[in-house]
Amino acid sequence: MHYAIGQSFLLVTPTQAARIYSGIATGSKVPKLQLIKKIYDHEKNFQAPETFQIDQSLLKIVKNGLEICVDSGTGQAAKLENIKVAGKTGSAEVPGTTGRTHGWFAAYAPADKPEIVIIAIAEKAGHGGTIAAPIAKRILEEYFKISNKPLASNNKPL
């Protein structure tokens, strides 16, 4: 049961989660980790993103679940007014503490034609839906330029 809910010895970095969500968002393309726009091999051939095989009916179920999470589930704090967001909250237990969790929120938007994948993590700060999802929402608002508020105010971090 621990693996099913992402606990125990299951370790995933934010970068790995972002790659997984990119694959879900696009339906098959998993970007390589890179800090540059395109990668070419030594013979100047463009290196296309990796792909993975997934049954399209399963992919549809996963995407639907991610949309429901934001529309009416634990990810509602990341909901945008005119742009559909797909995402999932998570809370990772902190070893050696009682009740302390790292809050996670992984998302992509727009859900029907993804442009951006976000992984928001708030260490030892609480649950994903109450802590990390609002952070992701502010980033999405800034990305899509749908907020008049500055990303951070009063010199306080998000």
Descriptions of predicted regions:
Residues 150-158:
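Intrinsic disorder/low-complexity segments
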Residues 1-48, 57, 66-148:
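Active-site beta-strand/loop architecture of penicillin-binding DD-peptidases
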